């Protein structure tokens, strides 16, 4: 599993947020509809606000059920990362993220399957065999590269962690 641990300073996630049900496999139609409802110009505006890592447009989940039960509601934020000192436009939701350690997992392949398989492998393989555990905070997906039709992609899954 392609993984690295990063010590990241405090930052904020800003963007457009919605409550959606958690779906474990396949595309989440609620998230797809939400993203499609945003004008293309809004995606471009968000990109111009990003000034820290993780870079680019991000898929953020927050407020997830601790047991990750399918069908439970979570907050999905379509946005970008900005430095803690940056000011966000008033029309955007903000998730403040404290400084801390992150496990960053890279996935390549069929989208969203390769990403979902990586999620599952973190719980079933990586966490049980490493001295880290999840800490409170959002989960972040960064799309590093993708096919034009989005059937394949290279992604990074950022999970907040602390030493076990």
Go through each PLM region and give its residues.
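A solvent-exposed interaction/effector surface
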Residues: 1-164
């Amino acid at each position: 599993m392609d993984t690295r641990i990063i010590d990241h300073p405090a930052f904020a996630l800003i963007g457009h947020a919605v409550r959606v049900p958690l779906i474990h496999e396949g595309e989440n139609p609620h998230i797809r509809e939400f993203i499609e409802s945003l004008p293309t110009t809004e995606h471009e505006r968000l990109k111009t606000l990003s000034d820290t890592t993780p870079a680019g447009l991000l898929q953020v989940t927050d407020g997830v059920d601790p047991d990750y039960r399918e069908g439970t509601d979570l907050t999905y934020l379509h946005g970008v990362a900005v430095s803690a000192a940056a000011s966000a436009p008033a029309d955007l939701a903000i998730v403040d993220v404290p400084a801390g350690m992150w496990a960053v997992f890279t996935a390549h392949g069929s989208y969203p399957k390769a990403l979902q398989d990586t999620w599952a492998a973190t719980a079933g393989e990586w966490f049980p065999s490493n001295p880290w555990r999840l800490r409170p905070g959002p989960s972040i997906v960064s799309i590093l590269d993708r096919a034009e039709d989005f059937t394949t992609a290279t992604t990074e899954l950022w999970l907040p962690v602390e030493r076990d």
